Amino acid sequence: MIEILMADDHAIFRSGVRRLLSDEEDVRIVAEAANGLEVIEQLRHRSFSLILLDINMGGRSGLETMRRIRAEWPMQSVIMLSMYPEDQYAPIAL
């Protein structure tokens, strides 16, 4: 089972991703976060197979959150999400 933490500051987007993945047998969104601070708090309490992380969120950006995740949980799998049409954030996120 792939257990996902979905992190995005738009509740409608989180709901859409949840709905999209609901038909997948081996995938579950088990937690949500509206900002980077909530992501870090969630990681302090449990582990996840995968984090879907928005690049631009309030509270702490996805890029800042990614740096923190890499420092404290270096083996954590993360997929960065962006609505930006440019790929300017790709090298930073890597």
Where do the language-model regions lie?
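Conserved hydrophobic packing residues within short motifs/helices of P-loop NTPase cores
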Residues: L5, V30, I79-L81
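Short hydrophobic/Thr-rich beta-strand motif most characteristic of the beta2 strand and flanking loop
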Residues: D26-A34, Q42
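The feature encodes the CheY-like receiver
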Residues: F13, G58, S82, E86
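Short amphipathic alpha-helix used as the core "switch/output" element in two-component signaling
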Residues: E41-Q42, L63-M75
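Active-site beta3 strand of CheY-like receiver
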Residues: R46-L52
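Acidic catalytic/metal-coordinating carboxylates
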Residues: N35-E38, G59-E64
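Alpha4 helix (beta4-alpha4-beta5 surface) of REC/receiver domains from two-component response regulators
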Residues: E64, P85-L94
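Conserved acidic segment of CheY-like receiver
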Residues: M1-F13, V17-L21, I51
